Amino acid sequence: MNSKVLVIIPAYNESTNIVKTVQSVSDCGYDYVVINDGSTDNTFDVCLEHHINVIDLPQNLGIGGAVQAGHKYALKYGYDIDVQVDGDGKHDPTYI
């Protein structure tokens, strides 16, 4: 049985990194959701511009709140496993 895996990408003010991060996750073949955690830069707009699957939190909830939003998304859409890769691109998704 193949598990359905979701990569949760919490992002706060990551407009310069988010496209590259999402691309690296996509290149590995994983589904993803970016959680824009109340960014004050244009992270959300960059996500929309690049047709990135994103949830926009109206205020900054911190890493815990952003990841929790991702867990809820995973449950809602029937994922078996979810993992976190930070929006700054410092986690290598090939290790998932």
Predicted regions and their residues:
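Conserved sequence signature across two-component system core domains
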Residues: 11, 35-37, 57
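Conserved donor nucleotide-binding strand/loop of the catalytic core
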Residues: 33, 44-77
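A short, conserved beta-strand element in the Rossmann-like catalytic core
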Residues: 38, 62, 90
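Short beta-strand-to-loop acidic/aromatic patch adjacent to the donor-nucleotide binding site
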Residues: 79-90
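Acidic helix N-cap motif at the loop->helix transition within catalytic regions
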Residues: 16-20, 41-49, 94
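Cell-envelope/extracellular polymer assembly enzymes that use nucleotide-activated donors
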Residues: 4-6
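Short, well-formed alpha-helical segments that are part of the catalytic scaffolds
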Residues: 12-27
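Residue-level signature of catalytic and energy-coupling elements of molecular machines
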Residues: 18, 70, 88
